[in-house]
Amino acid sequence: MKLPYLTAATGKNRKQIITFGGVNYSRDTHDGELLESFGLSSAQFPCLSQRAGRKKYADYTSPTALYARGKLCVVDGTDFLYGGKVVGQVTAGEKHIATINTKIVIFPDKAYYDTETEEFGSLGASYPGYAGDVTFTANTLAVPEKSYIDQAYEDAATVSGVDAGASITAYTGASVNKSTGALTMTGGTAKNPPDLKAGDIIQYECDSSKEYMVVQSSALQSDGTYQIGYVLHEAVLHEYPNFEELFSAGDAIDISGCTTLAKNNGSHIIRSISGRTLTFDKDIFAAGSEAGTVMLERKVPDLTCICECDNRIWGAEGTTIWASALGDPKNFYVYDGLATDSYAVAVGTDGAFTGCIAYSSTVLFWKENCVHKILGSYPAQYEIYTYTVPGIQEGSEKSLAIINETLFYKGRSGVYAYSGGTPELISENFGTRRFYDAVAGTDGERYYISMRDEVGEWELYVFDTLRAIWLREDNTHAADFAYLDGTLYYLDADTGKAMMCGQDYGEEGAIPWTATLCQFDETVHGRKGYSRMYLRADMAAGAWLKAEISTDGGPFRQVFATHDEQAKTVQIPILPVRCDNFRVRLSGKGVCVIKSFVREFAVGSEY
């Protein structure tokens, strides 16, 4: 009986990686993905290569904000720098910055810098009109050029060693002549220090022609004398500035403090200004002289996030969304029934606003669990739509960046991409890892995000938007990013330096890097006998490379190392071994491009 010939099965399998992916911390890994990376880039995809070099732009003492508008803007402590020059003072701390026309606006300081006029100033303004100095007509408000006022010192003072039997006249009233500054004291009664009480008015060891003291306390001392605590008042000549120095026609100002003419309190729009006279709409005031101290204010809301869209500054405060008057970041309360008016709307969703940004023809206001989308071109046309979607994580308001009409941001569960519909989670490869306090920027192609991990360590990741690859560059803690003239800048929160990305290695020198490939188990049961494994890499002159292997969860052991002063292509053999699974870790310093990884194996028994 003739039987057919059977071909002997060698059981050999061959697999190769010629396309390397990014990091993948999840269970769903694929050939070419990395369990960990450091100092790597996808710039030479499909190969693995090192990140570009970095160079120092400038050193700062305590920088907290970076912004680009024609030149770099930096907040260093309390200094606001534009193009390397200090142009104004702000409070220390984090900032939200946006630009409208030629004005760079800064919150929470409510300040601005005009790049054209080189003026640094305040968006808000206040103008006190002291008691008896403000005069109203039916449509005007005026103050005199000069007037003596009763000015109280801010800090209390004391006088010590006052004899218990000293006779001091205590008055019940004091007034200042507005024209001459002369003091008139009324209701005088002689008292001794033990009898003085809070609120008594005295003139003790002061210039009685223009000063008096309001008693705060009178206390017996150990030597039998008394110490009198007081607040000093002085008749001071006050010169009122022209209203043009603080206000402009069209400003909405809040008038408060009117007691004699209480009807005049409220918000009104200035129609014209002439020196120390403001003109408003007809017949809105009660005419007369106001006895109270009047405060005139151009108010600006305390916005916690801001952006610019369609020539308005948008922002959020509490549950309210605000928009400035058209082209005017100083006015948020102008309601004149015009298309140029300010705008405000309260929303009823839970939680605080966590960020806002202009996107396409809309403005997006984010919370952690929703987004409010505002459509329209002017206040009467504005409509707000609310969508329950994953929003921006609290503390990650600076993670917003737009690349090719896609908005990227950090949410609670990871990094999302938004294109107008439902946001898409693009960080599934992070698995169960969670990150916080993200700050991000872009070079126009890649999304750079610096964030804190579960144990508080900072990590800088880069997402290649063209290839959907995540790589960890290093442990940089970036306080802010800015993109200017083709270069991405960031503030290093640890060193206080402003750094430039995408540079050569002239300043940094050869950089260290590490790539740990995800575990190889060939997705089959049984121990595998590897007959051949090798890597192919191109190395620049002076670079070095080390290869290590870990089998069945054991420690890494070195299997190859090379260093050469000349550029070369190397083929790295890895000694065959029988195991269920293994990992490969590559590390080095200098330019080294990993091109492929080939392995041949046969599957044996499970033991």
Region roles according to the model:
Residues 62-63, 77, 82-101:
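Blade-loop segments of beta-propeller domains
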Residues 56, 297-441:
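Beta-propeller and closely related beta-pinwheel folds
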Residues 123-180, 186-198, 203-302:
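Small/polar beta-strand repeat architecture
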Residues 96-133:
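Hydrophobic or amphipathic alpha-helical targeting/insertion segments
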Residues 70-76, 103-107, 312-317, 354-356, ...:
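Short beta-strand elements that form the blades of beta-propeller/WD-repeat-like
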Residues 78-81, 112-118, 319-330, 369-375, ...:
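Structural motif
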Residues 1-70, 391-395, 402-406, 413, ...:
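Beta-sheet repeat architectures centered on beta-propellers
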